Amino acid sequence: SSLLRCYYQDLQSLRRRLTFAGISELLTAIALKIRHDSYLSSSQLITDLQQVSKKLSNQYHGLFVNLVQDLIKKINLFHFYFAKIDIRQNSSIHRQVVADILRSTSLCPDYLKLAEDEKIKLLSASIDNQGLSNGNYTALALEVIATLQAVQTIQAKNGLESIERYVISNTDSVASILEVLWLAQIVNNDLANQPALRLEIVPLFETIEDLANADQIMETLYNLPIYQKNLKVWQRQQTIMLGFSDGTKDGGYLMANWAIFQAKKRLSKLAAKYDIA
C-alpha cells in the first residue's frame, strides 16, 4: 500500500544516517520485510523498530534514537491503514441478495415471502453452508459478495481495524441484521487458508416505527445463539445507530427527537440487562 511505501522510504532515510554496526543490518532487514509484505500487523513492525531503538540507547548513547521513535509514533498513529473505513448498505439490498442466493442454491424458493421467525430459522440453519459465495447470481448479489471479499482482503493486508463496522441503514427487523451476519459468514466459509472476515455489525434504526421497535429487535437478537457468537468476538460490545433525518421526514422534528430519546433509554436498559457494553 502507499502507506507502507511511506514507511519504507522513512526506513531508507534512517539507513542512510544510521550506519552503525548492528543498526544498519537491522534496518536493512526491516526494510526488506516491508518491501516483501512480510509483516502481518503494524505491531510486528513496531516491535522490530523498538529493538533498533533499544540497541541505539544501549550501545550508541541514544544517538538518533529520536528519529526511530518518531517513526514508531507515526506507525502507532496510522498503523497499516491510515484511517478506518465503515461500510454502509441499505437493509433492502441485503434482503434481495439473500433471497437471490437462497433461490439460486435451491435452499428457499421465495425468501421474501417468509415470516420473520421463518427467516431467522433458515438463516441460522444455513449460515455454515459452504459454496454459497460463488454462483450464477444477479449483478447486485455478486457486487455485495465482492464487497465483502474486498473487505476481507483489506483486513488481511492492512489489519482488522482498517475496516470493521458494517452499518445497516433502515434496519427494521431481526432478519435485516442476521442477513449481514449470514452474508459475511458464507464468504468466510469459502476462504481457503486465509484470515477470516470480521465485521462489527451496526444496525441503524431510522423511521419512527423502527425506533419504537429497536429494543424488541435487539432483545430477540441478543438471545439468538448465532448472534451470541458474534457478540463474543466483539467482547460483548454492540454499537447501535439511531437516525434523525428519516425520523424527521416520518414524524417531524419533535417526534423524531422524542423517539430517539426514548429508544436510547430502552436500548441502554436492555444492554445493562444482557451485560452488553
Predicted regions, residues:
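Alpha-helical scaffold elements within enzyme catalytic domains, especially in hydrolases
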Residues: 74, 266-270
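Structured mid-domain segments that build the active-site/substrate or prosthetic-cofactor binding neighborhood
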Residues: 1-2, 269-277
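A conserved P-loop NTPase coupling/switch region
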Residues: 191-199
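Beta-sheet entry/capping signal
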Residues: 72-73, 80-84, 161-166, 198-202, ...
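Active-site cores of enzymes that catalyze phosphoryl transfer or operate on phosphate-rich substrates
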Residues: 83-85, 90-178, 182, 186-190, ...
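Short glycine-rich or small-residue beta-strand-to-loop segments that form or flank ligand, phosphate
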Residues: 35, 53, 166-169, 201-204
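Extended, charge-enriched "interface" segments that sit outside catalytic cores
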Residues: 1-157
